[in-house]
Amino acid sequence: MELSSGVCPATRLQEAEKAAVHKRSPKVLEALRKLNIQADQAPVIAVLGSGGGLRAHIACLGVLSELKELGLLDAVTYLAGVSGSTWALSSLYTKNGNMEGIEEELKHRYEKNEWDFHESLEKAIQASKRENYSLTDFWAYLIVSRQIRELQDSNLSSLKKQVEEGVLPYPIFAAIDEDLLADWRERKTQNSWFEFTPHHAGYPALGAYVPITEFGSRFENGKLVKSEPERDLTFLRGLWGSAFADIKEIKNYILNYFRNPFGKLKFIEGPVTYSEAPRMNVDAMLLDLVMAYFTDMNDPSIKDKLCALQQALGTETDEFGIEMAEIIQNWNETSAEKKEQFLDHLLDRFKKTQEDTTTYSLMNWNTGLVWDRCVFVNETRKCVSKWQWGTVYNFLYKHGKIADETMCSRELLHLVDAGFAINTPYPLVLPPVRETHLILSFDFSAGDPLETIRATADYCQRHEIPFPEVSEDQLKEWAKAPASCYVLRGETGPVVMHFTLFNKDNCGDDIETWRKKYGTVKLSDSYTPDLVRDLLRVSKENVKKNKINILSEMRKVAGNPGNIPRVNKEACLGDRVKDPQGSQTVEFKKSHNISKD
């Protein structure tokens, strides 16, 4: 069976996207007519939302709500987001575009301070059993779900219907290939960017895509050899929104889940019936040991915990017991590598015990919840040690028709927050294949709200992509007291309207006060209902105050959508992988021997 998407030349849209955009066009024309704008051909208007954590999530919801209220959202063809804005965009689609309902639900969550820790923990525990478990899973289910107070079980592919019918704009969610970040920093390589839509996932600059339902499955030489279930939106939100802070800050954030005594109780409590054996509860002891080792491998109490565990197991006379006694005796002199090997060995031993109930009968091992939590803590510990994020199978692995060795030699990809590159998804709507005429870019970044313009201008200059010219002096001057909107236009390429969140128009002289009030790493627990309402209000004001400007630019591109000169598509796709056989489409095919979990 031939898959609907594969590695395709990037000089054309994927067929499903092309059909959805075509279906959207009459809806756009109808919306423009309601706005008293006449057009024979629907211009392509894209709305972009930047990263910025929970601040971006709430502010982007405010922007979408006001765009819809003013009748502007119906004239939009593409919605694209980075990091926190992807959370808002995904909410729009899961709620069928009902912005009033989304807004009321958002306020309710923060008024009631709702978040189900146990459900989130169970999701993370189940994810830790996957071969490709990474910190993205932990982050998604225990951090992001807490931030936005929502677990979303639905899949990205489930959002196709309203997109295919043209009811809502076509969504694009941005990520970055972490393994290519060094190339990005040095050369701003195009193939660093990765995108997700309800139909596909892949590298737009390479023209390499896989159906979204097969994202995360194992491919080899273009054939699907092991199918994996489609990941839910909670996981994807964690992948799209993982650039909250620097490494040290994130690491401490994760470790605090296990250091906090209350957190430990949360992990151990639940419907667990501990053994009434004369020896101690081995299951709880092992979990306590793993958590102690995770938070501080040099903790002096670890040796005592090992001694107690050894006594409870009663393994002093067998081979493993002798090994255990030896490592306990020399624990303080043992290398970190050997300590880790022993801990893995210990857990493997316990796993075998579950399978052989005649072994160590005194353990009365609880084979369910506590064991799962031990595995979860230990797998998370390994990921922290290796700092592994966004691990998924590479659908280009060993593909015979891919010339780029870097892209086809890796069995695994590591996808992370696109904010590590540019905090707004300009690179995903600027390629000429999407023929964007007008971009409404809403910036919710911390710090300089013009930095994304600066970074995008540099990126476009390197790759001969049309983008309005901006001078560094001008950007610096604007950043001192940002206006709510800047209109940028060049001789070629789309018109860009860049909106700043906190500006002199809605904050007066208190811009810095507002920025401090809504820090990127600010936890949702510190967001009061008033803070949520205020952020929604100022983000809406930016749209409302600039309605006339937006309509003016819409009118201009609608009057002459062909005014954007054609550019050399090959030049704009300089990093695109070339098929060594020529211009033919490289396809994926399902193997006759597909394994399923």
Curated annotation (Swiss-Prot):
Xref: SMART domains: PLAc (SM00022)
One Gene Ontology term from the biological process aspect of the record: phosphatidylethanolamine acyl-chain remodeling
PROSITE patterns: PLA2C
Pfam families: PLA2_B
EC number: 3.1.1.4, 3.1.1.5, 2.3.1.-
A GO cellular component entry from the record: mitochondrial membrane
Residues covered by the PLA2c domain: 1-597
Annotated Basic and acidic residues bias: 587-597
Active site per the UniProt annotation: 83, 417
GO function terms (MF aspect): calcium-independent phospholipase A2 activity; lysophospholipase activity; O-acyltransferase activity
Protein name listed in UniProt: Cytosolic phospholipase A2 gamma
Protein's organism: Mus musculus
Annotated gene: Pla2g4c
